[in-house]
Amino acid sequence: MSKDRMVELLQEHFELNLYEARAYVALVAFGVLTPAELASVSEVPAPRTYDVLRSLEKKGFAMTQPGKTNKYRPVHPANVLEKFIQDWQERVKEELEAKKKAKEELLELMAPLIETEVPKYGVERVWVVRGIKNSTLKTKEMLEEAQNEILLADDGFIAVNLEDDIIKAVDRGVKTKILLTKNLLPRLKASKIIDYAKEGKLELRALDKFDLPMLICDEEVFFALEDLAARYFNYETQVWIKDHRVVALFKEKFNEYWEKAEKV
């Protein structure tokens, strides 16, 4: 029913509870109601009507009509809903600014902890990362911190979704080689990666397929463990290693793929 849908929308998007939403719909339908009348035409329990109507008035959805009997009329939906959205936008804007300031303050406060040369619980050289969100954050971190070299063998995520981070690294002067599976090329047709390859700012090649996708940034390597079920549910397990010996082994594999690949 349309009434149920109206109640649902008011609850979901305009911060009214169930009884408030039902009461407001009834007010819009009937125009002016006393608490007793509201109880008879809506599904708001009689003992709750006074509190519900006062709450609607406080939230700006209803107004009291002067007289001997308490009567309430609705504020026009176009007015109250637009006002709600404007207030919400302002509130979100303020919250966003507050979060940005908090982020900057936290980064400033944590800088000494990050930059300290004292090892914390030993030198961590191996991390296991699970889930697409965490993997994306780690990949972005590696691309942002790369100074000399990026070697990327990608079969479906990084080049398409983290193009800006790759381009920024190239613009910083990081030497970059990207190896893609050929099925990705149509998705990158209009990307800066293709443009940069044509301009010689990075090297780009393609293969039909390869068994071991990887990202190497300087002395770090990041790769996924083979688990088709986990990949289906976006919960792949990936491993990050910082060890020049391990990186050398992965570079050998990357170069093996690179030699077989076609220039794009």
UniProtKB/Swiss-Prot annotation:
Annotated signal sequence range: none
Keywords: DNA-binding, Transcription, Transcription regulation
GO molecular function, one term: DNA binding
Keyword Transcription assigned: yes
Transmembrane segments: none
Record feature DNA-binding region, as residue ranges: 33-54
Pfam families, A to Z: Regulator_TrmB, TrmB
Purpose: Binds to the maltodextrin transport gene cluster (mdxE operon) promoter and to some other TGM (Thermococcales-Glycolytic-Motif) sequences, but not exclusively.
Cross-referenced NCBIfam families: tran_reg_TrmBL2
Domain comment quoted from the record: Lacks the C-terminal sugar-binding domain.
Recorded family membership: Belongs to the transcriptional regulator TrmB family.
Protein name, as recorded: Putative HTH-type transcriptional regulator TrmBL2
Organism name: Pyrococcus furiosus (strain ATCC 43587 / DSM 3638 / JCM 8422 / Vc1)
Gene: trmBL2
